[in-house]
Structures are given as C-alpha cells and as structure tokens.
C-alpha cells in the first residue's frame, strides 16, 4: 500500500510541476491528436486533432452526440488533466461532464478554464484516486479515460472502478498506449523490449504498459458487452515531429525548462523512445471499448 501511495504522489507531483509548460505550448488538451495518416502536423492542426481524438473515441464506442434522445447525460473523464475533454464536450454537445485527476494543480487550472468559458454549471472537477473514485454506483452513462490508465499498476481495478460508476448500458472507453500482443509461444516480452518500456515508464511516471489482449481480457472478466479494439498508431504519429520541433526550438525549450523543469524535458525524451518503439513494432496506440450490461 505504501508503494501505491508513493506512486500516486509521484504522479501528482509530475503533473503539478509540468502541466503549465505543456498548456503554454499546446493548450488545454494534454493528449495526442487524431490525424489522417501521413499528415504534416502544425500547431493549428494539432488543436483540431486533439478535439477530433475525443470525437473519434466517442464515435468508436458507439456514443451518439447528434441524437438528443441518445446523447449522454452525464460523462466522466478519468484522468481529466486540464479538463479539456470536459470543456469541449460540455460546450459543443451540451453534455454534463465531470473530470477527476490526482493533481490539485490540474483541478485548479481546469476550474479557471471553466470559469473563463462560462461553463461552471456544466462541468465539475475533483481531486481523487481513479482506483477509489468518490462517486455513486451507476452515476455516469459514459466513463472515459484518455492516456491515464498507464499511470496505474492495477489496471483491472481501474477498469472495474470505471464499470462501477457507469450506469447500466454505459459505454466504457479506454484510449491508451499498449505493447504488442504476445505470440502463442511467448510467455513474456523479450528482455530488451521490457527494458525499453521501463525506460519510457520511468521518464513519464507510468507504472506499466499492457497489451491490447490484456485490456480485452479485463473487460471480458467484468462481463462487458460489445468489446472492440482499434489500432490508432498511424493516426497519432504525425504529432511527434511537431512535438520535437516545438520542444527543441529556443522558445519551446526555455518554456519547458522554466515552467516544467526536468519533468517536462523527460517527456520529450520519452516520446523519442516511444517513436522508436513504434517503429520497432513494440508500441501501439489503442482504443478499447465495451458496454456495461443493462
């Protein structure tokens, strides 16, 4: 238990320290964008791509945002960062959204952004633990997590908690990095692959990276229906050259160093390793969704 608490504190400190730097460079969405493969990313294009990622995730999970009768009433974003997803959905689709993050600094920033956009009555943000969320059973009809679950070692418990707070029929949506699935003859990844993933995790305070097969198994064990997966790796890699270009520009590097310190610089180093791991067929960007039984 002490190790878990220590890890949670490290994650909170990481985001408390580095959030301001990334917000200044790329805005309130602290996640990858969804691009057409082969696109050349720019800052304006990235702002469109990050909100497209949200729309694509909901579309993938079969969540209707067009039909008022089917539109979600209450969405939870687990690992909400600066609240960008909640703010976007509340503003565009008039959906009530709640975000939870382990970082008090992120909640403060999210609340300030909500106030600036006049959305205080449509969104709310809480500091809390994704493994023990302060919500009632069945409270949300969409439970969504975008690039958060890898900070947690017990991913099955993370998903179980998502399912608990989901209402009957709720969409459970996980967007995350995964490692390659093992072949039928393999018991584990190769030693050099394990070493690569550990280096990536250590740089950005991740606990571990799991396979797509693992996520399907966890959702299956929780009796979710309509489980499906999609490989979106080619849709996110156009962002990497832009990240490197901006981060290693004079303005970008100084901003990262002054506002984010070593924590922010380590993110760029991790993305360099992630880019190579993708090229090597080790790392993927994956969408996984299921539906809680009625």
Swiss-Prot record:
The record's listing under SUPFAM superfamilies reads: S-adenosyl-L-methionine-dependent methyltransferases (SSF53335)
Q: Where is this region: SAM motif I?
A: 75-84
Keywords in alphabetical order, please. Answer: Alkaloid metabolism, Membrane, Methyltransferase, S-adenosyl-L-methionine, Transferase, Vacuole
Its gene is TMT2
Subcellular location, principal: membrane
Q: What does this protein do?
A: S-adenosyl-L-methionine-dependent N-methyltransferase involved in the biosynthesis of biologically active monoterpenoid indole alkaloids (MIAs) natural products including vindoline. Catalyzes the conversion of picrinine to N-methylpicrinine (ervincine).
The organism's superkingdom is given as Eukaryota
The molecular function terms of the Gene Ontology recorded here are: S-adenosylmethionine-dependent methyltransferase activity
Which segments carry the region annotation SAM motif III? 165-174
Sequence motif: Vacuolar targeting signal, positions: 137-143
Protein name as catalogued: Picrinine-N-methytransferase TMT2
Family to which this protein belongs: Belongs to the class I-like SAM-binding methyltransferase superfamily. gTMT family.
Catalysed reactions listed for this entry: picrinine + S-adenosyl-L-methionine = ervincine + S-adenosyl-L-homocysteine + H(+)
Pathway linked to the protein: Alkaloid biosynthesis; vindoline biosynthesis
List, alphabetically, the Pfam families matched: Methyltransf_11
> Which CDD domains does the entry link to?
AdoMet_MTases (cd02440)
């Amino acid at each position: 238990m002490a190790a878990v608490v220590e890890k949670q504190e490290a994650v909170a400190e990481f985001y408390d320290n580095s959030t301001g730097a990334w917000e200044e460079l790329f805005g309130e969405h602290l996640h990858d964008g969804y691009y057409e493969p082969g696109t050349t990313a720019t800052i304006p294009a990235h702002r469109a791509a990050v909100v497209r990622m949200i729309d694509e995730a909901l579309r993938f999970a079969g969540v209707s945002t067009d039909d008022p009768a089917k539109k979600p009433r209450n969405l939870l974003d687990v690992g909400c960062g600066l609240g960008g997803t909640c703010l976007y959905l509340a503003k565009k689709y008039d959906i009530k959204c709640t975000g939870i993050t382990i970082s008090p600094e992120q909640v403060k920033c999210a609340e300030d952004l909500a106030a600036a956009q006049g959305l205080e009555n449509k969104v709310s943000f809480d500091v809390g633990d994704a493994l023990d969320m302060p919500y009632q059973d069945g409270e949300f009809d969409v439970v969504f997590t975008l690039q958060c679950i890898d900070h947690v070692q017990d991913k099955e418990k993370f998903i179980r908690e998502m399912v608990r707070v989901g209402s009957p029929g709720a969409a459970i949506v996980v967007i995350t990095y995964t490692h390659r699935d093992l072949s039928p003859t393999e018991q584990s990844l190769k030693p050099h692959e394990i070493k690569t993933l550990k280096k990536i995790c250590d740089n950005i305070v991740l606990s571990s990276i799991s396979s797509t097969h693992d996520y399907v198994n966890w959702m299956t064990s929780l009796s979710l229906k309509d489980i499906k997966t999609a490989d979106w790796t080619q849709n996110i890699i156009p962002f990497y050259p832009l990240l490197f270009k901006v981060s290693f520009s004079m303005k970008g590097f100084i901003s990262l160093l002054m506002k984010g310190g070593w924590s922010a610089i380590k993110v760029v180093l991790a993305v360099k390793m992630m880019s190579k791991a993708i090229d090597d067929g080790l790392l993927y960007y994956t969408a996984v969704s299921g539906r809680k039984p009625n």
